[in-house]
């Protein structure tokens, strides 16, 4: 969508699932708020509605301004290393981003994804910006596309059950969210994580989202901060889930 000379991208919630919840757009908007508090370079998303569906959260959209232009392009990491199997390993990615001066940014992205449990950081959802005229790499692209964060398929209000589900999620970069995030921590990142304690969402930017869900995700962030700092698995911090996460998950099927 073009507006006032700028290009905006609109993304709807998943309509293909059996029970479309509309949470993906809100997940994107919540992740955007968290990113603003934690990341240096990120794409900003906000919630918008079409006029005829203004009161239906399930018909929400997330909107962002395009981060590319005629002079600056984006190349996916997966396209850069299409024939290199080893390039999909976290250490290989870290080495690549270090080679273009973006090691700190990549480390932060991994910790951010663990904080919000973003399950969709595939090889096309990160990469580099380049000069369209010279093809010179300008740096790592800003963090974008976070609609699979904050468990968009979970529609309950029970925190322990949610964490039992969360304990079964896998990162797309490595298998273990918190193991990878803990591995890439630096002293600076530890300070940044500790400074996030007490994080609260701006409710005015999440119109229509129940307060109960917002509080669930704020508690999730608090638990993930402590788990990442300790290197503990998702849901294992005392007061942040159950000690028998798999058994609790099994009960959801009854």
Residues covered by each model-derived region:
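C-terminal catalytic region of ATP-dependent kinase domains
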Residues: 23, 131-254
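Short, low-complexity, polar/charged sequence segments that are solvent-exposed and flexible
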Residues: 29-32, 81-85, 160-163
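Conserved ATP-binding subdomain of kinase catalytic cores across diverse folds
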Residues: 1-77
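Short alpha-helical "patches" and their helix-cap loops
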Residues: 45-54, 123-131, 238
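Short C-terminal domain-edge/linker segments immediately following a structured domain
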Residues: 39-44, 94-97, 171-178
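A broad, structural surface signal
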Residues: 8, 29, 33-37, 104, ...
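ATP-dependent phospho-/nucleotidyl transfer catalytic cores
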Residues: 56-58, 62-110
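Conserved kinase catalytic-core segment
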Residues: 89-152
